[in-house]
Amino acid sequence: MKSVILKPKNLVLLGAGVTTTYYLYKFFSAPSVSKDEGDKFGFNAPDPAALARAAVKEKKERFVKPSDNVCPILILYGTEYGLSAEVAKKLEESINSKLEGFWARIIDMEEYEIIEFEKEQIVLIITSTYGDGVPPTTARPFFDYLEANRLNLSHIQFSVLALGDRSYPHYCAAGKTLDKQFEEMGAKRFRDRIEVDQEDWTCFDRYIDTVCGLVPTLGGVEKREGQDYLYEKAKLFALSQGKYNKKKPYSSKLLVKRVLTKGDKVGIHLEFELGDSELKYVPGDALAILPDNAASEVSAIISLLKLSPSFKVSTPGWHYQEGEQPNPSQITLTHILTKCFDIHNCKPELLQLLKDNVKNQQEKEKLTNLLAQGTGKSNTQLVEFLENHHLIDILKMFSSARPPIDDLLAQLAKLLPRYYSIASSMSENKLAVSLCVAVVKYDLHGSERVGIASTHMADRMNVGDRVSIFINNNPDFRLPEDPTTPILMVGPGTGIAPFVSFIQERKALGHTGENHLYFGCRRSDEDFLYSKELQQYHNDGLIKLYTAFSRETSQKVYVQNRLLENSQQICDLINAGGHIYICGDAKSMAPQVHETLSLIITKHMSIDEADAQALLHKLEKEKRYQKDVWF
């Protein structure tokens, strides 16, 4: 099974694998600053006891009814990177602000055990599709539950909003599955399933408006008195969660930082302590890093806004809890722009807000032109503009627009965690977790720009500094259970990271299955990541290492060439029950390796191409052929 990943346009990882696709907003960090700096940013609350009481109140308010006699609505979302959650939150807010007599409650599918469907009447489902057409990782137990338990949902009226990406196979598959399952269990669809390609807020808003228009017309629903059953069940569920997780990340100390490469592209190895976090991972998982925006860029933005850095704004309800104490109700403008919002990836709605507030006629005409074809993905001019302009560029370009700061912040995307494949094994070291990261720097509109997370770690963190982390499980990229099973790993360039973890794990546990590793890069003396370690593993007989250096000879050599040179060996590995893993570029490398494998099978197993493709598909279904790839 493959996990296909879209990279944010300005983020390149040497830690291969899981990275962000959409604008995730609910993952949280403790401040990577000292107490004094925390006071400067407004992190440290003057009255911890009062804040603790406020936190308890806030948690209770999640399922406290606004009035005693309302019709409850369940909004159920499944998300991998947060977009479904963001849409679900907006739908919840729209229903609760516009529809009198109705009350929307929002639940992540990972909390499905607290739901009593026999007590629900209207269910609105929002889910993304991950990887090779599978549900989001944390939503999978819910999908399995529905498959194993044929519920009677004949009393429920429902609608599904399916999120996907047309560039991948199995478009919106998870949403289609839930739509079909609810129908088969007797639920009545009051709005046909809507499928949305990527982050198209025009479509999202249209769906929200449609639902808000249809819900009051539904028959057969009744208002409910008394406390909602979810009130107590949600509190019990919260108590069952681990000490640290994506909703309360661990503030980890940087232990080691060293450069892995030479030349113009810099790659670094990082090690973070796990301490008493109780965080656990297995090879194939990713580490999420919650970065800060660069202080210089934040200062420049505040200067353009003509506001004080210490200007107080409301703390976003989704903002992560910083440390053991709850967040204060207000934080500084510096804090919110440093920790909360993505100042590189701007949304179309920001331009609409500026257009509504702009004073200069030329600026207004430019904004009008950009928005002439709407704010959806079909407006290619707008999409291209936003891809090439950060918040600082936009504020400079439309300097006469001065919308209220709260309105401007409301149109910014949330700052995402960055995901890096883990390059270590807990079987070898339980006290730390390792990554390798490419330091991203590039030119845009005459100024040097940097990747948010990579430069946060490379340039702004020293050994001893802290950053917030959590583990992101990747169940579709796992070592075989049988320690004698041979494995084939193809990880050119950035794809090496999880295979370092694989090798360390098999070594520590004494696995006897053969380990074949194919690695490729430009030059052996510039970007051969972990070259000494891999060559030592090879010399010790732990792995069989095959390298391809594309720029060392006049004829470029890639991992595909090395695979072809060892065709019979690869067929023997498949016939022996071996597992195949590919990690790296999804646009060219992974498809080319797939076709190379098909060619090898066709030639050496004496079958035609269709049968070779069918065999590879069978291996995928059996989880003997797994991909962790990204664009």
Curated annotation (Swiss-Prot):
Top-level taxon: Eukaryota
Residues bound to FAD: 249-299
InterPro entries (alphabetical): CysJ-like_FAD-binding, FAD-bd_FR_type, Flavdoxin-like, Flavodoxin/NO_synth, Flavoprot_Pyr_Nucl_cyt_Rdtase, Flavoprotein-like_sf, FNR_nucleotide-bd, NADPH_Cyt_P450_Rdtase_alpha
SUPFAM superfamilies according to UniProt: Ferredoxin reductase-like, C-terminal NADP-linked domain, Flavoproteins, Riboflavin synthase domain-like
Limits of the Flavodoxin-like domain: 73-212
Gene3D superfamilies: 3.40.50.360, NADPH-cytochrome p450 Reductase, Chain A, domain 3 (1.20.990.10), Nucleotide-binding domain of ferredoxin-NADP reductase (FNR) module (3.40.50.80), Translation factors (2.40.30.10)
Cofactor note: Binds 1 FAD per subunit.
Annotated NADP(+) binding sites: 504-630
Positions of the FAD-binding FR-type domain: 247-480
EC number: 1.6.-.-
Name of the gene this protein is made from: redA
Biological process per Gene Ontology, one example term: sorocarp development
GO cellular component: cytosol
Needed co-factor(s): FAD; FMN
Record-level Gene Ontology MF annotations: flavin adenine dinucleotide binding; FMN binding; NADP binding; NADPH-hemoprotein reductase activity; oxidoreductase activity
Binding-site residues for FMN, renumbered to this chain: 79-83, 160-191
This protein's UniProt keywords: Developmental protein, FAD, Flavoprotein, FMN, NADP, Oxidoreductase
Description of the deletion phenotype: Cells develop only to the mound stage and accumulate a bright yellow pigment.
Name the UniProt record assigns to this protein: NADPH oxidoreductase A
Job description of the protein: Probable NADPH oxidoreductase that controls development beyond the mound stage.
Pfam family, one: NAD_binding_1
